[in-house]
């Protein structure tokens, strides 16, 4: 890691961010070819090939790749299903799920999620989960 630096994009030339944009267009299939991607972002193919393997976006700490949620759900039909639907609507994937036997009309659920494909950010997902009528308590137990 001695060869790497974290620097603010403000001090870098604009074309480095355009290299990232071009690579993201190719990865998402928004552009079919390098030529198309570079033309759309306004850099030469030479610039793209020169820097594509050397410039990367820093991971946003608020956008981890895995999360562990602890939920307290009302013991009603469809409660867990509503939670899972909300999770998948945000394009998160359930890695593990553990539901305790309901006590006092509430069930405890521990869920780990893969957030690699998350639409939006973790805060939006948490807010949408909290807004579900079945969810009585929600805690983000961990984020990696």
Swiss-Prot record:
HAMAP family referenced in this protein's UniProt entry, alphabetically: UPF0735 (MF_00707)
Domain of life: Bacteria
Protein name, UniProt field: UPF0735 ACT domain-containing protein Ldb1351
InterPro entries: ACT-like_dom_sf (IPR045865), ACT_dom (IPR002912), UPF0735_ACT_dom-cont (IPR008310)
PROSITE patterns: ACT
Family: Belongs to the UPF0735 family.
Segments forming domain ACT: 68-143
């Amino acid at each position: 890691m001695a060869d790497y630096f974290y620097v603010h994009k403000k001090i870098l030339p604009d074309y480095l961010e355009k290299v990232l944009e071009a690579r993201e267009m190719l990865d998402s299939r928004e552009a079919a070819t390098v030529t198309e991607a570079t033309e759309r972002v306004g850099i030469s193919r030479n610039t793209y090939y020169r820097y594509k393997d050397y410039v990367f976006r820093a991971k946003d700490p608020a956008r981890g790749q895995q999360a562990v949620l602890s939920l307290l759900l009302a013991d009603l039909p469809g409660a867990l299903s509503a939670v899972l639907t909300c999770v998948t609507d945000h394009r998160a994937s359930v890695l593990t799920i553990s539901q305790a036997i309901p006590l006092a009309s509430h069930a405890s659920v521990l869920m780990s999620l893969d957030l690699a494909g998350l639409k939006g950010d973790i805060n939006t997902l948490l807010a949408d989960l909290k807004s579900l009528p079945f969810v009585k308590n929600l805690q983000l137990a961990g984020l990696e």
